[in-house]
């Protein structure tokens, strides 16, 4: 199982997250995003969640107003990828508390961080939601401590100048 790309696309076709696990030019990425988004968005809800695209498979799942889309090799297992997508959504739900599109727009770096804890080089790295969330929360605590230390140093620096 190797994911080539992971996209989050709104119903309007706006890309909310894009993670590429293969090296592609910006032009190729834009074409894939355009083609795959229009392919997935226009499908009816009762249709299969797997689509052929240029010798690859597209696996997608819709949650509320977002499509979670993965591009995989032809011989990879689609059902495992659906589970990976679901695991990612569950992790986002736990982290944000019932995640919505606005959470992903305004906190996209956190969503990427959750994805990076879950996936490594297109492979499932961590299957435990608890481990993923504890790593993300530890990173949050560390960045919070760094921010406090930076503001404290700025405050001390401004006092010394007086």
From Swiss-Prot:
One matching Pfam family: Clat_adaptor_s
InterPro entries: AP1_sigma, AP_complex_ssu, AP_mu_sigma_su, Longin-like_dom_sf
Effect of gene knockout: Leads to hypersensitivity to valproic acid.
Function comment: Component of the AP-1 complex which links clathrin to receptors in coated vesicles. Clathrin-associated protein complexes are believed to interact with the cytoplasmic tails of membrane proteins, leading to their selection and concentration.
Family: Belongs to the adaptor complexes small subunit family.
Assembly and oligomerization: Adaptor protein complex 1 (AP-1) is a heterotetramer composed of two large adaptins (gamma-type subunit apl4 and beta-type subunit apl2), a medium adaptin (mu-type subunit apm1) and a small adaptin (sigma-type subunit aps1). AP-1 interacts with clathrin.
Listed name of the protein: AP-1 complex subunit sigma-1
Organism expressing this protein natively: Schizosaccharomyces pombe (strain 972 / ATCC 24843) (Fission yeast)
Biological classification of the source: Eukaryota, Fungi, Dikarya, Ascomycota, Taphrinomycotina
